[in-house]
Design a protein with these regions (language model features):
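Conserved alpha/beta cores of soluble small-molecule-handling proteins
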Residues: 1-109
Length: 109
């Protein structure tokens, strides 16, 4: 199985998110789950609009929705199934312990 992590497809067995990612340490992140049918995410535009709105609500940097679309397409193409789920996770990224965000930038899975 392949996943998207910060700019490219990776094998699920080797992909790693830092334990210092703010999505893990303080819940600083948002996610969407889209149904996929015949290799296409259902209502992807609505899901991405909600992802961006939720990110703004947390004060996260605006997600690059073109990159998110490319990621979704790449993951669906790399993992062909007739019916599936596509989980999009966007976090504050690697940051120091505590509530301040670091300079590393957001994480996209």
């Amino acid at each position: 199985m392949k996943i998207w992590l910060d700019g490219g497809l990776q094998d699920i067995d080797s992909a790693r998110v830092s334990v210092l990612d703010h999505g893990l340490t303080v819940g600083d992140g948002v996610f969407e789950t889209a149904k996929t049918v015949a290799g296409r995410p259902f209502a992807l535009t609505r899901h991405l609009d909600r992802l961006a709105r939720s990110a703004r609500g947390l004060g996260l940097p605006e997600p690059d929705l073109d990159e998110v679309r490319r990621a979704c397409s790449a993951v669906v193409e790399a993992n062909p199934v007739a019916l599936g789920r596509l989980r999009i996770t966007y976090t504050g990224g690697v940051s120091p312990l505590g509530s301040d965000r670091g300079d590393h930038g957001p994480t996209l899975v």
